[in-house]
Regions:
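Anion-recognition interface
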Residues: 1-330
């Protein structure tokens, strides 16, 4: 065995894996997020010590599971323009050179909309276009450019970071999955995923409920209005006044309202991206998406050659639920 390091991306179901799936695995040790962040993100680039990181993670590294989406870099700062994303990959390689790297990717337009909604949930006030392109209007020497960078489209050009991990670990140790395949059949995907990595997990006891549900349109506007009364918790925002404690209160109110289902349906990508912006973004990501497709096709060929679990079938088990039986392709 070797350590499994699930690095994200953001908005690809990592919260569900952290809360519901990995903690139920019986033959591996799931490392808490705080420990993972301390091991790989606390030290500066010139002060990182792989031996210290291994000590923080604990003994028997080969049976560990790590899952932390910020290993790909911060969502609202583009991984510090990709610099942190790239450096963390090197940190993982120096600390756990035999690790199996897991990367989930998502359609970039869907990921962008989900990222903006998460920004609003986290205290953001700006609209989608301002969130995406707000820094484009700054001059090259504007003082704001010396502060924390904002969102960057390149963060979701995921093939670049995948290729970097391929170069560091070898593509056989880097496993890439589409979030859309995961969402299409949670139980089936989880069964095949567990079989792929030899994970001992009883799927009958897993909580399959969604995490971080999307906002409805009324709640989106309400959230942006409430966020004007707190400075927390994102850097790139406006506020009228900072009311102590309001951030926590407003988050609880928003979660309860969203969970009630009384404020309309959750917003989808098509509700928030007009045709012109969608076309602009598709063009931006077109080259990277072609390379990503080729990378996934290569992985599928290698899986077929090696007899890896690729798909699953559902079988009746005597009650309303369905048990999962991994299907091996030889």
């Amino acid at each position: 065995m070797a350590a499994i390091v699930h690095i994200g991306y953001h908005k690809t179901g990592t919260t569900w894996f952290q809360d519901s799936f990995y903690p139920t695995v019986r033959n591996r040790r799931y490392i808490p997020r705080a420990t993972v962040r301390a091991a790989f993100l606390d030290a500066g680039a010139l002060h990182f010590d792989p031996a210290a990181a291994r000590r923080r993670l604990g003994d028997a590294p080969d049976d560990m599971i790590l899952c932390e989406e910020n290993l790909t870099g911060g969502l609202n700062n583009g991984g510090l323009a990709g610099n942190l994303s790239k450096d963390v990959a090197d940190r993982i390689r120096r600390t756990l050179p035999d690790a199996q790297i897991v990367i989930f990717v998502r359609d970039p337009l869907s990921a962008i909309v989900s990222a903006w909604l998460q920004y609003v949930k986290g205290g953001g006030t700006f609209g989608l276009r301002r969130y995406l392109f707000g820094r484009d209007s700054l001059s090259p020497v504007a003082p704001e450019r010396d502060e924390a960078p904002g969102f960057r489209l390149d963060h979701f050009d995921t093939i670049r970071l995948i290729a970097h991990y391929d170069a560091l670990f070898g593509p056989d140790q880097v496993h890439v999955f589409r979030y859309e395949d995961f969402r299409a059949d949670l139980r089936g995907f989880a069964a095949a995923y567990a079989a792929r990595f030899g994970l001992d997990v009883d799927l009958a006891y897993i909580d399959w409920s969604a995490r971080n549900p999307s906002l409805s349109r009324p709640l989106l506007w309400l959230a942006r209005a409430m966020n004007l009364f707190t400075r927390r918790a994102v850097a790139d925002k406006s506020w009228l006044i900072d009311i102590p404690g309001w951030y926590g209160v407003s988050r609880r109110l928003l979660r309860r309202a969203n969970a009630s289902g009384r404020f309309g349906r959750p917003l989808a990508t098509r509700d928030l991206l007009d045709d012109a912006l969608a076309s602009q973004l598709r063009a931006h990501y077109a080259a990277g998406e072609r390379l990503l497709t080729a990378r996934l096709q290569w992985q599928a060929r290698m899986d077929k050659r090696d007899g890896t679990v690729l798909r699953w079938r559902q079988r009746p088990c005597g009650h309303d639920d369905l048990a999962q039986s991994p299907s091996h392709r030889r």
